[in-house]
Amino acid sequence: MAFNLTLLLCDNMLVSSTTLAAEIFYFAQAMDRASNHEVQDVVIRRVTPDGKSVHTSAGFELQATHSLADSFDSDLIHIPALWRNPRPAVSKYEAYIPWLREQHQRNCNFTAVGTGVCKIAIALILLAQP
């Protein structure tokens, strides 16, 4: 059985806030292998609302592997830090909010760094509304 890590991508995100999460999970998997432990595969998905690439604050282009319309499991969803004011990204990526709510209802776990926490906060605030 695989561990499913989903990395949400946004324009103007801090690239290291996403790539570091992927590297940490791959490192943990490598350490398990080196220690001769039973190793759970790590499946990492890079997701955007439409499956298209994003441009990070450092000018890197990151290609998504999936869109929100695709069907896949997530054990952990990682939300990146955004460059400067997160409000424009929250508006531009509004489609993430209902999707995050749905994942929360499926008992998915979340991590977020820096300004990425605002997406979780907005999604959870919306859970309390009818």
Model-derived regions: residue spans:
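A short alpha->loop->secondary-structure connector
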Residues: 126-130
